[in-house]
Amino acid sequence: ILIGLVGSEMCIRDRDRIFRKFGLSGKSFIPMLIGSGCGVPGVMASRTIENDRDRKMTIMTTTFVPCGAKLPIIAMIAGAFFGNSGWVATSCYFVGIAAIICSGIILKKTKMFAGDPAPFVMELPAYHWPTVSNILRSMWERGWSFIKKAGTIILLSTIILWFLMSFGWEGGSFGMVEELNESILSKIGTAIAWIFAPLGWTKAGEGWKMAVAAVTGLIAKENVVATFGMLYGFAEVAEDGAEIWGNLAAAMTPIAAYGFLVFNLLCAPCFAAMGAIKREMNNTKWFLFAIGYQCGLAYLVSLCIYQIGTLVTGGGFGIWTVVAFAIIIGFLYLLFRPYKESGSLNVKVKGMAKAR
């Protein structure tokens, strides 16, 4: 039934009034719905939006919806830190929806996206049941797409990760190393770990592993779990998974872990989805702006979660706590400041009244 509704676009008719309040078009609903399965077709579905501003904003926000590739990350964090609590997965979808709503409101107040959403006009076809052939073809396309992705991108990146974590310089010579901290991967992770220090990814000297996992997630989100599996030796633990959860729990606090989860949900998607964004934007500057906005938003939200969460749970008050409060104040200002168009309109109306 859902496939039939998506195919006929009947479900977006009642969403237009709601989406317009957030600066989006009702047609943005379909890309976001499809994006819950995979970001690539979700981004491509934005082609149905005629207005260029609305289309670009939809492209930038569609991947905030947790896709299927992000579900293993949600399951891993929920199992390791929150006792498989169901609220973790539920909250991830609410975080994604909140990011879309807030982004729509804030971006619509900028010069790049200013203006009312385009009027919703479309020809509604008759309701129809989805055919079996369409359902099977859709299942095959999505299944085959994942098989190709798993056999190429994920496999290749896993091999590269294995090489980087198995080789390094030890005793002045290059070769296989026994200590993971002497590997090439450790050196790379240590070099970039300081960037994520304000997010709390530094417990017990494990920050470089979190940094590496987050970066490999840009290749494919499934790589986050695969990276942890290689770094913590998931294949060598018991079937009940107790050692897995223990290893991860020793690497981060629960608050930092939830921030890590939110970062991976909101930051730039996988390479395939980024390629789709590049094609749909058809402009390098817009592509870089979209990726930069997604990564920047993910970083700031994760920072606020960790700093404020740590303060509330009895942690210390430091310079990054002040930064977090400043970010929240700035965010609230951008969210609730009046539209410039409304102000100029009021001035014109008052001027016309005085002239009369």
What are these regions, as identified by a protein language model?
Residues 78-80, 93-108, 154-166, 262-264, ...:
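Hydrophobic core segments of alpha-helical transmembrane domains in multi-pass membrane transport
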Residues 109-110, 334-350:
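Membrane-interface capping segments at transmembrane-helix boundaries
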Residues 9, 22, 43-55, 159-295:
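Extended, low-charge hydrophobic alpha-helical regions
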Residues 13-40, 114-138, 181, 185, ...:
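Juxtamembrane inter-helical linkers in multi-pass membrane proteins
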Residues 64, 68-90, 275-283, 300-318:
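Transmembrane helix-loop junctions at the membrane interface of multipass transporters and ion channels
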Residues 83-84, 113, 117, 127-176, ...:
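Long hydrophobic segments that form regular secondary structure
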Residues 1-7, 12:
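Single conserved hydrophobic/aromatic residue that forms the stacking wall/gate
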Residues 41-118, 229:
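Conserved phosphate-handling catalytic cores of large alpha/beta enzymes
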